[in-house]
Curated annotation (Swiss-Prot):
Lineage: Eukaryota, Fungi, Dikarya, Ascomycota, Saccharomycotina
GO terms, molecular function: transaldolase activity
GO biological process, one term: pentose-phosphate shunt
EC number: 2.2.1.2
Protein name: Transaldolase-3
Catalysed reaction equations from the record: D-sedoheptulose 7-phosphate + D-glyceraldehyde 3-phosphate = D-erythrose 4-phosphate + beta-D-fructose 6-phosphate
Quaternary structure and partners: Homodimer.
Chain's role: Transaldolase is important for the balance of metabolites in the pentose-phosphate pathway.
Keywords: Pentose shunt, Schiff base, Transferase
Family to which the UniProt record says this protein belongs: Belongs to the transaldolase family. Type 1 subfamily.
Disulfide cysteine pairs (residue numbers): none
Pathway annotation from the record: Carbohydrate degradation; pentose phosphate pathway; D-glyceraldehyde 3-phosphate and beta-D-fructose 6-phosphate from D-ribose 5-phosphate and D-xylulose 5-phosphate (non-oxidative stage): step 2/3
Length: 9
């Protein structure tokens, strides 16, 4: 959660 470039995946 939010670990890859501010993604919510």
């Amino acid at each position: 959660y939010g670990i890859h470039c501010n993604t919510l995946l």
